[in-house]
From Swiss-Prot:
Belongs to the complex I subunit 1 family. It comes from the Eukaryota. This is NAD(P)H-quinone oxidoreductase subunit 1, chloroplastic. It comes from Phaseolus vulgaris. PROSITE patterns: COMPLEX1_ND1_1, COMPLEX1_ND1_2. NDH shuttles electrons from NAD(P)H:plastoquinone, via FMN and iron-sulfur (Fe-S) centers, to quinones in the photosynthetic chain and possibly in a chloroplast respiratory chain. The immediate electron acceptor for the enzyme in this species is believed to be plastoquinone. Couples the redox reaction to proton translocation, and thus conserves the redox energy in a proton gradient. GO terms for biological process: aerobic respiration; photosynthesis, light reaction. GO terms for molecular function: NADH dehydrogenase activity; oxidoreductase activity, acting on NAD(P)H, quinone or similar compound as acceptor; quinone binding. Pfam families: NADHdh. InterPro entries: NADH_UbQ_OxRdtase_su1/FPO, NADH_UbQ_OxRdtase_su1_CS. Its main location: plastid. HAMAP family: NDH1_NuoH (MF_01350).
Length: 363
């Protein structure tokens, strides 16, 4: 059998085309991940700038204004400074625990973003147990803080790590019970299904109106999980210098700084998804469909609008969190634990029982 030169060239071209197609499919998998990383980075920088401007307004001072227009590049300048600072390690500390602690805290929080629906069909992984995966992953972060405190070989750092673990356990349980109530109302543990269940009646279909007590408990528990004032006992300056961060410097200290704002952002996003309708607009779907032709496959414009609505609701909660931080005093450790175990836990349990009863009677 004789094969001429043209056929050989066609075969080589076909194999080359298939190779480039496989490379393109592999690279396309990383495009959504890259978009999420860039979006999260910009959001964290925006939150840092907002916090500095809001705190300056509350305290009647100017705030950052020289680094970029209106001081928007101040957070970037601070991050660059931390990147080039010397990375100090305690001579008598556990180097492995000391080094892995910040990384575990940051990675566990970043993984939580994988189940958040930012818009229609704009979610990294739509899992059937999305909200439980978030709770499971977020519970790993205090382990990193405890490792950091123990590995520092410093009494203030160790006490800060113990406080972080105790605080996380105290407020993780009420938060989980509130998520269970939302899952019962939506008949699903998927974040996408929970958002869809709130879309039928627009503004009045939000879980905020059906679960007002659960919303308040979830709000307080989220602030406590973020370890922000009035719940920043693990890093109380007057008592523990900087808590588990005391011995850290350079990029490792920067990781804790980033983890704090990443946690605030992910908590705000879950408040939006679980209680504020996610990416849904406030107009009921029935009324919108009468005026606009809505296809099953939404376009890019609808996705962008959904992302914009999600971010607006999220930054509204972030504004409340920042204002709370700069207006309320810090709780004592006994007040913190009493609030979690004696008030929020019974309220969340009662809310879960009421939700279960209403769902059973509605069958």
């Amino acid at each position: 059998m004789i094969i001429d030169l043209t056929e050989i060239q066609d075969i080589h071209f076909f194999f080359r085309l298939e190779f480039f197609k496989e490379i393109y499919e592999i690279l396309w998998v990383f495009v959504p991940i890259l978009i999420f990383i860039v979006g999260i980075t910009i959001s964290v920088l925006a939150i840092v700038w907002l916090e500095r401007e809001i705190s300056a307004g509350i305290q009647q001072r100017i705030g950052p204004e020289y680094t970029g227009p209106f001081g928007v590049l101040q957070a970037l300048a601070d991050g660059t400074k931390l990147l080039f600072k010397e990375n100090l390690i305690p001579s008598r500390g556990d180097i492995r625990l000391f080094s892995f602690g910040p990384a575990i805290s940051v990675i566990s929080i970043i993984l939580s973003y994988s189940v958040i629906p930012f818009g229609y069909n704009f979610v990294l992984s739509d899992l059937n147990i999305g909200v439980f995966l978030w709770i499971a992953i977020s519970s790993i972060a205090p382990i990193g803080l405890l490792m950091s405190g123990y590995g520092s070989n410093n009494k203030y750092s160790f006490l800060g790590g113990l406080r972080a673990a105790a605080q996380s356990i105290s407020y993780e349980i009420p938060l989980t019970l509130c998520v269970l109530s939302i899952s019962l109302l939506s008949n699903s543990l998927s974040t996408v299904d929970i958002v869809d269940a709130q879309s039928k009646y627009g503004f009045w279909g939000w879980n905020l109106w059906r679960q007002p007590m659960g919303f308040l408990v979830f709000l307080i528990s989220s602030l406590a999980e973020c370890e922000r004032l009035p719940f920043d006992l693990p890093e109380a300056e007057e008592e523990l210098i900087a808590g588990y961060q005391t011995e850290y410097s350079g990029i490792k200290f920067g990781l804790f700084y980033v983890a704090s704002y990443l946690n605030l952002l992910v908590s705000s996003l879950f408040v939006t998804v679980l209680y504020l309708g996610g990416s849904n607009i406030s107009i009921p779907y029935i009324f919108v469909s009468n005026f606009f032709e809505i296809n099953k496959t939404y376009g890019v414009f609808v996705t962008i609008i959904g992302i914009f609505i999600t971010l607006v609701k999220t930054f509204l909660f972030i504004f409340v969190s920042i204002t709370t931080r700069w207006t309320l005093p810090r709780l004592r450790i006994d007040q913190l634990l009493n609030l979690g175990w004696k008030f929020l836990l019974p309220i969340s349990l009662g809310n879960l029982l009421l939700t279960t009863s209403s769902q059973l009677f509605s069958l």
